[in-house]
């Protein structure tokens, strides 16, 4: 006699991301926070600061983390604040008008590749002048309405924080980035699965997860090799 056994006790691991919810009236803030357009738009930065000035300073001016940590009570206060809600609505309309402009099809499309991009300290994927130049190039491409796609890397630890010891020696402190709390989003394929690209390297295949950072009108695709497939 054969007995068919189902392995019901085997664990089924799934990724679970816990995020705080926003009231319907504030949903547009999440879209704004996940587009780095706010980096060079002072009205947007001032708005995020005014949502909670103390918290804004604590999260080092990262709007994604700011919204994640806003208290329920503060969210309710914002919704009831007519002046603040008017600013939110006006800013979102300004953002949508900016984003709805179609790329100039009379100019050639551009693919831009760089090892680092300096756009904001909330996205630690740069360390020096090369990154700052690349970041400015992408922002200018967005404002100039260039049909451009940029590609780079998403580093788990990014650059280090530098301090000095009592003896004057450099101390490097590495802090891991939580990709769910910075202005990037995972890219999915047509089947709804996280997109992964395979890159041949000597005798191996390197598997890179794909993320995207929205820099105004420009998509910045970031490859992340810090995963269990490697």
Regions found by a protein language model. Give the residues of each.
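Catalytic cores of carbohydrate-active enzymes across secretory and cytosolic contexts
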Residues: 1-230
């Amino acid at each position: 006699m054969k007995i068919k056994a189902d392995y019901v006790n085997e664990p089924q691991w799934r990724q679970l991301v816990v995020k705080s919810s926003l009231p319907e009236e504030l949903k547009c803030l999440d879209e704004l926070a996940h587009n780095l357009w706010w980096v060079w738009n002072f009205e947007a930065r001032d708005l995020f600061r005014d949502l909670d000035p103390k918290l804004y300073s604590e999260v080092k001016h990262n709007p994604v983390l700011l919204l994640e940590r806003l208290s329920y009570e503060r969210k309710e206060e914002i919704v009831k604040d007519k002046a603040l809600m008017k600013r939110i609505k006006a800013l979102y309309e300004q953002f949508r008008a900016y984003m709805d402009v179609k790329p100039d099809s009379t100019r050639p499309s551009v693919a831009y590749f760089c090892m680092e991009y300096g756009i904001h300290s909330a996205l630690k994927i740069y360390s020096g002048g090369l990154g700052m130049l690349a970041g400015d190039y992408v922002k200018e491409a967005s404002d100039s309405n260039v049909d451009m796609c940029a590609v780079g890397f998403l580093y788990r630890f990014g650059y280090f924080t530098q301090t000095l010891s009592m003896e004057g020696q450099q101390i490097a402190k590495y802090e891991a980035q939580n990709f769910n709390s910075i202005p990037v989003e995972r890219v999915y394929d047509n089947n709804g699965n996280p997109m992964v690209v395979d890159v041949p390297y000597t005798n191996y295949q390197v598997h890179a997860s794909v993320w995207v950072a929205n820099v105004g009108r420009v998509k910045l695709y970031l490859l992340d090799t810090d995963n269990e497939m490697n």
